[in-house]
Amino acid sequence: MRTIFHIDVNSAFLSWEAAKRLKSGDSFDLRTVPSAVAGSEKDRHGIILAKSFPAKKFNIKTGEPVRSALEKCPELILVKPDFGTYRWYSNKMFGLLCDFSDKIERYSIDECFLDYTGMESIYGEAEDGARLISQRIKDELGFTVNIGIGENKLLAKMAGELE
């Protein structure tokens, strides 16, 4: 039986923005307050691309117009997207994951599937391996991930979406 991990960065663009700022000496973590990465309303790209967990409490949704999000939460901190930073963090994460398996399938900039089959003798049972991966990403890169475990990609993705 195969063991597949679905690895998904939590609020990727916002998490990567926060990690970058903390790494460069900023003491304020965007993930702890209502905040969002969003395009510019002026340039007619004014939608929410990613939001913090505190912003979710105001029912702010990904893809929502900035104007609507600000009506729900006037103190929402907005950050312009920096896709170069997001590519850098994505590539660093995928590089780290190569330490655990050479069978990795990128699903998007912030998600992938990792075939953990046969790795138990090195890193322990699947749950132990998932915890190790999650902890290394947090310690080395400064952000968190959800990891779903299943016998195939569909089940792994579904498991990762469970709360």
Regions found by a protein language model. Name each.
Residues 1-163:
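Gly/Gly-Pro- and Ser/Thr-rich, intrinsically disordered tail segments characteristic of DNA damage-repair
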